[in-house]
């Protein structure tokens, strides 16, 4: 009975995380679900037509449109699809149909207010595009704390340029683990350092990433998700799918405009003692192991529709054109070098590449079957000093 009550309580908590939900007669949701721009000639402004629309995840507060470097963005009118009954207004008080100047990194803030008037969220809209291929070395020194829309704070990683420009390119499943562990004052309370994906100071150089397979507590067991592997990947994590179609929650890949040639870096790894399957049954025939791999894929299908690979197809999609997969993550207490060349299975269209028509996913995980909620609690993978080499 206690477990059932706990699970029902957590379901309520998860709803609040995704959309400001509250049991009121009028709708209490206050989200921007989509942002879009209508222009007569999208090819002159965007890399491809799909870039005219941005899907906004429930955890996001920054909305960035990907535009060509030469695009005129001095008089643009963003438009929004919001949750039913909600209203949106510019923070500066100007009408929504006012053309805005987004040149030179300028931003505009908009506030969404729920139908019941009790809740609001502020979003920042910007335009521009700097791709990941402008960076080669990833030391994971830039750590931010997620504090909004969660039960407890947890780590997240970003990359920054010399001028301070930030690329929010790395994602983890920490948000899903946060849901499974309930609110801060319950019996399953965990601290930031007990999350699956954590920043640590004892890196090979400076900080490192520690990925640990963790027990998800009574709620996770009830949902047939008994473990959460520590993971770090290029892409986004969709909290709205964390308790539903879980494989779709991991949205793998970010746009690139150069061909990746090699993925290298350093790791340490130790498997947990006991491997359990999704039913939380011990499987003595399997020793857990970590995984490191990268996938380059076309981000539009044959119909021209935008595609993002997820946990269900990131290794199998026919849109994949290159992979870099480690042969083995060995058990070791020492920082161990890995160097994985990309193997190309299809020709790269240089025009498509230049217009950001390919996405790159790089994935690190403490349990090789973590996407299916199988693994050994305590399996730990440390990652540091990762390098991506690009074709110039």
Features from the language model and the residues they span:
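Short carbohydrate-recognition loop motifs
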Residues: 200-219
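Bacterial Sec-dependent N-terminal signal peptides
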Residues: 1-31
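Extracellular carbohydrate-recognition regions
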Residues: 129-186
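Residues within well-ordered beta-strands of beta-sheet-rich folds
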Residues: 111, 139, 262-268, 293-295, ...
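Extracellular carbohydrate recognition
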Residues: 352-357, 367-390
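Extracellular-facing segments of soluble proteins and assemblies that are Gly/Ser/Thr-biased and enriched
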Residues: 215-302
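Extracellular carbohydrate recognition and processing domains
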Residues: 301-354, 376
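Beta-rich interaction/scaffold domains
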Residues: 20-138
């Amino acid at each position: 009975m206690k477990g059932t009550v706990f699970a029902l309580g957590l379901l309520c908590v998860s709803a609040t995380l995704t959309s400001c939900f509250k049991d009121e007669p009028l709708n209490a949701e206050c989200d921007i679900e989509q942002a879009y721009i209508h222009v007569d000639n999208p090819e002159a402004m965007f890399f491809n037509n799909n870039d005219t629309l941005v899907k906004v995840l429930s955890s996001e507060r920054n909305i960035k449109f990907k535009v060509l470097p030469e695009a005129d963005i001095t008089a643009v009118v963003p438009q929004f699809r919001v949750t039913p009954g909600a209203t949106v207004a510019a923070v500066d008080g100007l009408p929504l149909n006012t053309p805005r100047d987004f040149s030179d990194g300028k931003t505009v803030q908009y506030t969404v207010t729920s139908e019941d008037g009790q809740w609001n969220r502020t979003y920042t809209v910007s335009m521009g595009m700097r791709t990941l291929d402008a960076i080669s070395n990833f030391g994971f020194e830039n750590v931010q704390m997620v504090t909004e829309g969660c039960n407890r704070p947890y780590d997240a990683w970003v990359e920054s340029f010399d001028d301070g420009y930030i690329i929010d390119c790395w994602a983890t499943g920490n948000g899903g683990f946060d849901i499974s562990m309930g609110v801060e004052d319950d019996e399953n309370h965990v601290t930031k350092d007990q999350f699956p994906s954590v920043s640590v100071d004892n890196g090979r150089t400076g900080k490192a990433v520690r990925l640990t397979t963790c027990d998800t507590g009574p709620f996770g067991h009830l949902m047939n998700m008994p473990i959460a592997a520590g993971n770090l990947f290029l892409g986004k994590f969709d909290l709205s799918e964390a308790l539903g179609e879980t494989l779709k929650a991991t949205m793998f890949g970010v746009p690139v405009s150069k061909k990746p040639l090699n993925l290298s870096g350093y790791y340490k790894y130790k498997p947990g003692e006991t491997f359990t399957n999704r039913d939380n049954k011990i499987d003595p025939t399997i020793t857990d192991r970590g995984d490191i791999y990268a996938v380059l894929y076309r981000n539009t299908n044959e119909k021209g529709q935008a595609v993002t690979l997820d946990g269900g197809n990131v290794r199998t999609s026919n849109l994949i054109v290159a992979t870099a997969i480690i042969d083995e993550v060995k058990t070791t207490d020492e920082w161990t070098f890995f160097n994985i060349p990309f193997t190309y299975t299809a020709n790269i269209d240089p025009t498509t590449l230049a217009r950001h028509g390919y996405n790159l996913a790089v994935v690190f995980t403490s349990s090789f079957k973590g996407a299916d909620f199988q693994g050994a609690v305590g399996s730990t993978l440390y990652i540091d000093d990762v390098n991506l080499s690009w074709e110039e």
